[in-house]
Amino acid sequence: MQYFFPELNYLQTGAEHLHTINGGNTVFNSFRVTERTKGSRVISTSDVKKEFLKKFISKPNSKLGLNFDTTLVMGVLNVTPDSFYDGEQSFSEKQFVEKGLNLLKDGCCILDVGGESTRPGAKEVASSIEIERVIGVIKKIKQSAPSAIISVDTRKAIVAEKALQAGASIVNDISAGSFDGKMFGVVAKYKAGVCLMHSQGLPENMQNKPHYENVLLDIYDYLKEKIAKAESTGISRKR
């Protein structure tokens, strides 16, 4: 498998075949091509087909109301008792809602609400508890801020479905659908967005000698496989 990485060109004067990445302000005129068995090499953008180049220079067309012309900031709302920050404050549901609304006022573009800690060593939380923690918060934030874009941080399809019904529009799954085989079906059913993450094992054991042959290429291969599975389930790349 070959992976192509734009080589950024900050010195535009005199450079040939300059292109902007996804219609933004960053320019490039070459790719670093990386393969597992052949290492990497640099080629000019003129050496690739125009249709392939379009994937890098076309402006993203999100179906989620996100503007990719600027930096997007995600505000994180940990509705868990063992959060390194939120949990230590012993917030009530009302306070979590207020904090979420303040994050939106401060300029966050996506509000990520999670009811299960997935830090290294964390134990799994029952779906019923996770639902109890996040659904009321999501509903009340959407009532006060109807245009807010909310993601739910969960590995479980039933939690994702309840959150989408409550007003979330994105599922942020650290397991990329590996933990719950029904996850992609729920995302497709509700035409939601999905954020695919990488991890080895479960939070309980993720730090017990994780092994990679090539950490970058292993992660790229993993995410490529998950993207293909999501698409085969009916989830558009635009989501």
Q: Locations of the language-model features?
A:
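N-terminal accessory interaction module
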Residues: 1-65
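Structural preference for beta-strand elements that scaffold enzyme active sites
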Residues: 30, 72-76, 109-112, 149-151, ...
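Glycine-rich anion/phosphate-binding loops
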Residues: 51-58, 84-104, 129-132, 176-181, ...
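Conserved anion-binding
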Residues: 79-83, 118-121, 166, 178-239
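Catalytic beta/alpha-barrel core
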Residues: 130, 147-155, 169-180, 215-219
